[in-house]
UniProtKB/Swiss-Prot annotation:
GO biological process: DNA-templated transcription
EC number(s) on file: 2.7.7.6
Family: Belongs to the RNA polymerase subunit omega family.
Protein name as catalogued: DNA-directed RNA polymerase subunit omega
Gene3D superfamilies in alphabetical order: 3.90.940.10
Any matching Pfam family: RNA_pol_Rpb6
Residues in the signal sequence: none
Alphabetized InterPro entries for the sequence: DNA-dir_RNA_pol_omega, Pol_omega/Rpo6/RPB6, RPB6/omega-like_sf
One GO CC annotation: DNA-directed RNA polymerase complex
GO molecular function: DNA binding; DNA-directed RNA polymerase activity
Biased composition (Acidic residues): 137-151, 159-180
Subunit structure: The RNAP catalytic core consists of 2 alpha, 1 beta, 1 beta' and 1 omega subunit. When a sigma factor is associated with the core the holoenzyme is formed, which can initiate transcription.
Length: 180
């Protein structure tokens, strides 16, 4: 076959759209490393997939199922018929210790585990290292630490100074408006 056309493949599928879907799926399989059923003949994977469909070396139904399976968001699980719930049992009663919150609802084990604080074990070497780091490395003069009473200003004094400044601004604004 020198050249593959849609007419060569259209009798193998129901519509040209399905042909595109099936050929694309086979090209993806070839890109992922599957070996082609025909000789490559220096062709690209899309051409090889069309040649395989035209020559019936690959089943179209398998490619359709593969494409549909990949596009599904929820893959159906095969149930073997055994009921696992009865074998495992209900562990809620064994885990629940009977604690009840203030609102009257039971406290589940996962909630209790979050409320219990984790105890941290610290060695004595770590404590010594932390206390050594907590001490300041810079010497501070005692005179600078204790403020003079003359320079100490309370918040009330600052608030009074701000209100005085505002009233003087308002008075100066009033005098400017009357002068003009």
């Amino acid at each position: 076959m020198a050249r593959v056309t849609v007419e060569d493949c259209i009798d193998k599928v129901e519509s040209p759209y399905e042909l595109v879907l099936v050929a694309k799926e086979r090209a993806v399989q070839l890109n992922s490393g599957l070996e082609p059923t025909l000789d490559r003949d220096n062709d690209k994977n899309t051409v090889i997939s069309l040649r395989e469909i035209a020559a019936d070396t690959i089943k179209v139904s398998d490619l359709t199922d593969s494409a549909i399976h990949k596009l599904r968001k929820h893959v159906e699980q095969v149930d073997d018929g055994t009921d696992d719930d009865e074998i495992i049992g209900d562990d809620f009663e064994s885990m629940y210790k009977g604690e009840i919150s203030k609102s009257g609802t039971p406290i589940l084990p996962s909630k209790r585990a979050r409320k219990i604080p984790e105890k941290i074990q610290v060695s004595s070497d770590d404590l010594e290292e932390l206390t050594a780091k907590a001490e300041p490395e810079v010497d501070v003069d005692a005179e600078l630490e204790v403020g003079d009473e003359e320079t100490a200003v309370s918040l009330d004094q600052i608030a009074e100074a701000e209100t005085e400044a505002e009233t003087t601004e308002v008075n100066s604004d009033d005098s400017e408006t009357t002068n003009s």
